[in-house]
Regions:
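SIR2/sirtuin-family catalytic core signature
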Residues: 57-181
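Extended, H/D-rich, highly charged conserved domains that either
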Residues: 1-53
Length: 181
């Protein structure tokens, strides 16, 4: 699922059954048209609890993070105005000292020197990778197999072949061939 943690103008939700999808779709259970999701705007105090769709998205993300071996943070600055969201993520990830094998991957345009301090509540010692763009990230270098390759490199000492990764000059057709072949 794609989870829209701050709502989405293209998403709809069935309050009765907890189902969601595009706003033009119908609930697969009751067949009624989805209601539009609410949006959370960039304000100091966001309410992640009162709207059922947003609350359920955050619960799903928390569970996924809790069970994850690796997290990729893509262009998220964790602003002080989003303290509630950062706290929810920290709670889900837990103590980084108990995540001794897990890896954090950050894709951002900020300087690499800022990463360890900015994400200190998630990074165990040096267990992170920094990329300025998607193509040099684990996701871009090892599509469909990023966690598997990170585990092989760091836990099994197997050198990874990143020649099958995505490149900036690839067309949609190239991407499709790369993924499915």
């Amino acid at each position: 699922h794609i989870l829209c943690l701050h709502g989405n103008v293209a998403m709809g939700y069935c309050e009765e059954h907890g189902e969601f999808g595009t706003k033009t779709a119908n609930c697969p259970i009751c067949m009624r048209k989805f209601s539009p999701t609410k949006l959370l705007y960039p304000v100091a105090q966001k309410d992640y609890e009162s709207d059922a769709y947003i609350h359920n998205c955050w619960k799903a993300v928390q569970q996924a993070i809790d069970e994850s071996y690796m997290i990729t943070i893509f262009g998220y600055s964790a602003p002080s105005s989003d303290r509630s969201a950062v706290d929810l993520l920290k709670h889900a990830w837990g103590d980084p000292q108990k995540r001794q094998l897990e890896e954090i991957s950050v894709i951002d345009i900020i300087d690499e020197e800022e990463i360890p301090m900015k994400w200190k509540d998630f990074i165990h010692t040096h267990h992170y990778q920094y990329s300025k763009d998607f193509y040099s990230s684990y996701l871009g270098l090892f599509p469909r197999r990023s966690c598997e390759m990170v585990f092989a490199m760091f836990c099994l000492n197997v050198w990874a072949d990143n020649t099958k990764g995505f490149r900036k000059d690839m067309s949609w057709s190239d991407l499709e061939n790369q993924i499915y072949n």
